[in-house]
């Protein structure tokens, strides 16, 4: 049986025989042909993908030479099994901080573009239920095309997971529609200021519905949020009750979405989960859109919009607003998976600052001094709350690890 170990000492001791090998006739010095193997199941040694024969098998070594050389691999040889190749390091792996920054920039950029284009559509086509359906429909088509080409590969869904995702999708649909009703009724900056109250509703739901103990420091950090939103609401020039109440319902809906999401934790990747939620939410949103806005749309809605901007622009605006809506949500999910909870929290706060600031600049919304101060206080409160909550979560994680 062939030996499986080639002793380094044997090889080193045979080095003086190099000159002897050099003087041997070519016919006697030639080594037997050695074939390169992708894998070796029994006998032989692999060095950089070449199989070496033990010294007992070499006719040259019988003449006193014990130096072994690997033969060149054949053209069809496969070195992958014998040599552990170092995978090339890509740009994203080499510069993780820069990559994360790029993800955040893309998330903010898509979010700002969506909010601006969305509000421009409402200025000439004030039908938020229908536009909400378009947002989800474009996203669903995008997901179906992605599944078709295998980017990503569709993850199968069973009845149990479907039952868990339906409540999440219903809350997502309600929160999405009411957000758009608010966007159509009031200034974008005001809607986002009211939606800054979402952490307050999350804390309340955790305390009184889930029975979780919320530290007093978290409750105190929410006081500036409530005060700031109240100040901004009292002097908001575009204020109306429809916009305010719709934004509040959106906060409650997204809070319940978070609760149901915790119950629907699964190993499925976030891209597939969001795709299934979008499909279910679309089915939920279609009936109210047809009932509430359908007759008016067929009578005057579509014709008025086409008369104002033209058919091509109208259709392209609806397509792109849906595309930006889906992409910003998907990139947000992918971004937040890359970072720690504290970075996640800061990112959410900065996103809202970006959207409020750009919407004021683009649309030239006039805001009173009190509204500006109230918005700033609310954003600062959200930042404080997010920081404290992230610290608490990190302490819990370290305690579990210990």
From Swiss-Prot:
The keyword Membrane applies. One of its GO terms (cellular component) is chloroplast membrane. Residues 118-129, 229-272, 392-402 are lumenal. It is a multi-pass membrane protein. Residues 1-72 form a transit peptide. Residues 73-96, 151-207, 293-370 are chloroplast intermembrane. The chain crosses the membrane at residues 97-117, 130-150, 208-228, 273-292, 371-391. Keywords: Chloroplast, Membrane, Plastid, Transit peptide, Transmembrane, Transmembrane helix, Transport. One of its GO terms (molecular function) is phosphoglycerate transmembrane transporter activity. Belongs to the TPT transporter family. TPT (TC 2.A.7.9) subfamily. Homodimer. NCBIfam families: tpt. Mediates the export of fixed carbons from the chloroplasts into the cytosol in the form of triose phosphates. PANTHER family: SOLUTE CARRIER FAMILY 35 (PTHR11132). This is Triose phosphate/phosphate translocator, chloroplastic. It comes from Pisum sativum (Garden pea). The lineage of its organism: Eukaryota, Viridiplantae, Streptophyta, Embryophyta, Tracheophyta.
């Amino acid at each position: 049986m062939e030996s499986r170990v080639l002793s380094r000492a044997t090889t080193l001791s045979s080095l003086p025989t190099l000159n002897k090998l050099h003087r041997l006739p070519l016919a006697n010095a030639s080594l037997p042909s050695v074939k390169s193997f992708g894998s070796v199941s029994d006998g032989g040694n692999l060095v950089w993908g070449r199989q070496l024969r033990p010294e007992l098998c070499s006719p040259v070594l019988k003449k006193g030479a014990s130096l072994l050389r690997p033969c060149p691999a054949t053209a069809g040889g496969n070195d992958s099994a014998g040599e552990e190749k170092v995978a090339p390091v890509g740009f994203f792996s080499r510069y993780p901080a820069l990559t994360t920054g790029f993800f955040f920039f893309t998330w903010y950029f898509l979010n700002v573009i969506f909010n601006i284009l969305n509000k421009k559509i409402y200025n000439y086509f004030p039908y938020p239920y229908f536009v909400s359906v378009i947002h989800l429909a474009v996203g669903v088509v995008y997901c179906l095309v992605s599944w078709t080409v295998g980017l990503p590969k569709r993850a199968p869904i069973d009845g149990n997971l479907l039952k868990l995702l339906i409540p999440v999708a219903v809350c997502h649909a309600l929160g999405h529609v009411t957000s758009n009703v608010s966007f159509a009724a009031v200034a974008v900056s005001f809607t986002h200021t009211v939606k800054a109250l979402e952490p307050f509703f999350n804390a309340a739901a955790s305390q009184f519905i889930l029975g979780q103990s919320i530290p007093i420091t978290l409750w105190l950090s929410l006081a500036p949020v409530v005060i700031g939103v109240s100040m901004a609401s009292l002097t908001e020039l575009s204020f109306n009750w429809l916009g305010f109440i719709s934004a509040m319902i959106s906060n409650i809906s997204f809070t319940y979405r978070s609760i149901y999401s915790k119950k629907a934790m699964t190993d499925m990747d976030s891209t597939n989960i969001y795709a299934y939620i979008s499909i279910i939410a679309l089915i939920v949103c279609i009936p109210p859109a047809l009932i509430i806005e359908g007759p008016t749309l067929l009578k005057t809605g579509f014709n008025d919009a086409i008369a104002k901007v033209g058919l091509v622009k109208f259709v392209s605006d609806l397509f792109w607003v849906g595309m930006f809506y889906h992409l910003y949500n998907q990139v947000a999910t992918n971004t937040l998976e890359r970072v720690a909870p504290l970075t996640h929290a800061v990112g959410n706060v900065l996103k809202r600052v970006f959207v409020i600031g750009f919407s004021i600049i683009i649309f030239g919304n006039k805001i009173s001094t009190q509204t500006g101060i109230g918005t700033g206080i609310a954003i600062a409160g959200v930042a404080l709350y997010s920081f404290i909550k992230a610290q608490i979560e990190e302490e819990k994680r370290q305690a579990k690890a210990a």
